[in-house]
Amino acid sequence: MADHITFFRMKAQPGKRQAVIDHFAQDEEFTRESKGFVRAIVVTSSDDPDEVMAGVRFDSTENYNANSNDPQTGAWYQGLRALLASDPDWFNGTLARELSR
């Protein structure tokens, strides 16, 4: 069973980039305890002060979907969405190859 990866690109409302970044910290304990969670990253654009990208990795699509369908995750997402200028662009996939040190 391959790991599930989701990337999402977001455009923060003007002046809300740090609030978007901070919002990711609000649910860290819940996320860490989620079954199958491996890692999450948040990246800011070097070119656009309002653009943020994030990625999350779970050990399976099943565990990712269970987390996504959890009401606590839904509430967290609604809080995030309130800080964004529009809906995120999503990319869901299966880990095909990885290189790490």
Where in this protein do the model-derived segments appear?
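Short, well-ordered beta-strand segments in beta-rich or mixed alpha/beta enzyme
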Residues: 3-10, 40-70
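An amphipathic, aromatic/His-enriched active-site/gating alpha helix that lines ligand/cofactor pockets
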Residues: 26-39, 57-91
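Residue-level signal for secondary-structure boundary sites
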Residues: 16-18, 62-64, 98-101
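Glycine-rich beta-strand-turn "strand-cap" elements at beta-sheet edges
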Residues: 1-5, 38-50, 76-101
